[in-house]
Each structure stands twice: as structure tokens, then as C-alpha cells.
């Protein structure tokens, strides 16, 4: 295919490329993290909140477009390319799409550096780990999405990780604080009580995010096998995977009830869950 054969990225194609409806539902962990910070700590830093909102949205845009390109490159099934992968059936230039997506990632990382200076250095390592998973989820010789670990990694990063950072940047006293001193002395201060609270309220989002991916992988099992993508349902078998599926959202509900019963989070804050896919 020559350059003249490639289609231009119009706004309708761009919205399809970034999976816009999924981006809107993906904002729920982010908004919940902001809401929980206000509820639990009585404080919202509006500058940090706006910065992280923009950074997280740019990361979400990057992930969608980047994944489409990687899936296009690694695809084995011609029918998948003709009907499912937008890079292929829309005749988009994969290089141009990558340039666009990495521009979003650059914006997100730049904002992240600003947030590190406004909070603490530990955020650099937390955010760096999240970006690592975002890139190598579909990239590399053995992408994470083609392993049975996909659900276990995407859920904690996209679900819990987003809730954690959204709360972290708004806390008056950070639960994790990293500092460097003279003579190569490093101090790491951790408030286990606050971290446990964040873990408890963030786990439902991690579980539900994994549930959505697990359901998608069950539905796409035949197509994934043709593309040599061996996810968790492949190893479990479709029948067993379908049997296990209902327990995932039930586990999320259990953690919600525990949070409400022990007054870690009020039930009203969880209204976001009614709009969360699963």
C-alpha cells in the first residue's frame, strides 16, 4: 500500500480509533478517586486534579490507538483485519497513527513530571510502572495481552492505579513519601492504614476492570486463537471461563460492602459503580 492509498484521519475516524465510548466509561475510576479524596481527606487540589485528569485522558487515548496498531502488526487472521482492526479496514497509515498516539503519551508524561514536583518523587515510580504496562500490554516480543496475565495486570493498573493516584495527588499528607539525603541515604515513609483504605476502596474498580477484559476475551476466544493470542479463557476453556465469570463482579460487590460497613467509604460515593461497565 502506497502513501496515496492511506486514508486521512478525520474526526469520525479519530473517535473510532480512540474508542471514545470506552474512554468515557474509563473515567469512572478517575472521578471516583477524586470523590473519595474529598470524602476521606476533605481536600481537593484543583490544579493537581485538572493536571491528572488531562494526563490520564491522554494515556487512555494513547493506549487505544497504540493497541490498534500493535494488533494490526501481529494479526494472523485475514478476516480480523478486514472487519475488526480499524488500521486495516480504514486503510490508515500505522506510522502516522503511532506518531499521533506517542504525542499523547508525551503530553501525559510531561504533565506527570509536573505532578511529581507538586507531590513527591514516589509518583514517578508509580506512574512509570503504569506506563510500562500500558506500552508492553500489546508491544514487545511477548505482549502482556497475549498471556493469561492480561486481566491480572490491566485491572490493577487501570482500575486501582487510577483511583490511587487520583486520591494521592489530593491528600494533605501523602501515605507514601520518598526522600533522598546526603551520603546516599534514602528514606521511604509509608502510612499502612491509609494504604489499606485505598486498597479496599480501589479493589472493586480493579476487579470490575478485569471482569470487562475477561468477558471480552471470552467473546473473542476463537478470533484470539487465530491471531495466536492466548488469554486466560484459552487456558481455562470457554465453559469454565463462563462459569467463573459471575464470581468476579460478586467479589467487587463484597469489597464495596466491607468499605461501607466499616465506614471507610459511604455508599453514596459508590454511585459511580452504577455507570461502570461489567
PLM regions: where:
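Topogenic membrane-insertion module of multi-pass membrane proteins
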Residues: 1-56, 63-65, 141-145, 154-161, ...
Amino acid at each position: 500500500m502506497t502513501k496515496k492509498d492511506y486514508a486521512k484521519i478525520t474526526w469520525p475516524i479519530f473517535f473510532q480509533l480512540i474508542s471514545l465510548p470506552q474512554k468515557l466509561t474509563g473515567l469512572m475510576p478517575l472521578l471516583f478517586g477524586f470523590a473519595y479524596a474529598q470524602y476521606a481527606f476533605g481536600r481537593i487540589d484543583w490544579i493537581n486534579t485538572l493536571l491528572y485528569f488531562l494526563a490520564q485522558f491522554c494515556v487512555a487515548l494513547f493506549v487505544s490507538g497504540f493497541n490498534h496498531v500493535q494488533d494490526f502488526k501481529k494479526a494472523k487472521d485475514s478476516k480480523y483485519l478486514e472487519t475488526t482492526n480499524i488500521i486495516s479496514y480504514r486503510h490508515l497509515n500505522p506510522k502516522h497513527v503511532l506518531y499521533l498516539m506517542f504525542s499523547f503519551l508525551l503530553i501525559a508524561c510531561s504533565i506527570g513530571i509536573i505532578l511529581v514536583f507538586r507531590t513527591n518523587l514516589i509518583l514517578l515510580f508509580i506512574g512509570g510502572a503504569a506506563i510500562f504496562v500500558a506500552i508492553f500490554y500489546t508491544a514487545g516480543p511477548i505482549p502482556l495481552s497475549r498471556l493469561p496475565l492480561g486481566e491480572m495486570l490491566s485491572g490493577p493498573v487501570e482500575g486501582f492505579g487510577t483511583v490511587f493516584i487520583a486520591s494521592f495527588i489530593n491528600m494533605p499528607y501523602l501515605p507514601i513519601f520518598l526522600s533522598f539525603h546526603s551520603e546516599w541515604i534514602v528514606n521511604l515513609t509509608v502510612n499502612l492504614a491509609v494504604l489499606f483504605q485505598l486498597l479496599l476502596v480501589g479493589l472493586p474498580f480493579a476487579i470490575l476492570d478485569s471482569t470487562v477484559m475477561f468477558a471480552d476475551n471470552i467473546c473473542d476466544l476463537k478470533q484470539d486463537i487465530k491471531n495466536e493470542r492466548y488469554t486466560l479463557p484459552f487456558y481455562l476453556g470457554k465453559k469454565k471461563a463462563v462459569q467463573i465469570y459471575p464470581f468476579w463482579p460478586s467479589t467487587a460487590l463484597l469489597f464495596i460492602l466491607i468499605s461501607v460497613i466499616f465506614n471507610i467509604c459511604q455508599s453514596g460515593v459508590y454511585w459511580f459503580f452504577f455507570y461502570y461497565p461489567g
